[in-house]
Amino acid sequence: IVGYTNAGKSTLLNTLTDAGVLAENRLFATLDPTTRRLSLPGGEPVLLSDTVGFVRRLPHGLVESFKSTLEVATTSDLLVHVVDSTSVDPLGQIDAVHEVLDEIGAGHVPELLVFNKADAAPDEAARLAREHFGSVAIAARTGEGIDLLLRTIGDRMRAITAVVELLVPYDRGDVVAAIHREGEVVSTANEETGMRIRARLASASVGRLSAFVVEGAK
């Protein structure tokens, strides 16, 4: 979850996962990323991480100091970009976030725009969502639009995931646990050299587990 400061990122994470993250109207209220597991409507598990709020013309030195905090964005499969619909310049805030994402090397990560605070500015949130194809208008504080958001995340994640087969040695329970944690296990079979697991995984997970992927498996 990324976005300009005070866009409602922590509130959204709390609404989706009961994470108990501090949600305040002040600069850098969130400094360390909080990650929580969430099951999408189709049953697929995902990991959601909150990040520090971005601001315009963030000094390069400050970007460097926050790089470890922001690094989670560079390894994500999808960026849920939360935008404050009550802002006087929401498009400028979107551009500011994109600038920081480019600077930290996350500009290539697929993005889902989420126009928040529809409870306070319903017409503006709806207008922004109409003008940005594939985006969603929500009110994280009240829960309005959350069901649609979850379905949209599920659709986007399915579009960037693949079913792969992995052969994991029996002494690598940590790898088996990671597959269950990061993806959706379709089937398992015990073989002489290890457990063959067929699972739906995002591209980043496939990369991390590449040593166990069975090439050419159907």
Locate each region found by the language model.
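C-terminal-of-GTPase-core extension/linker across diverse P-loop GTPases
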Residues: 1-14, 18, 88-92, 99-218
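Conserved catalytic-core segment of NTP-binding enzymes
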Residues: 30, 34, 60-72, 82-106, ...
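Generic enzyme active-site microenvironment
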Residues: 48, 82, 114
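Short, flexible active-site loops
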Residues: 77-84, 133-137
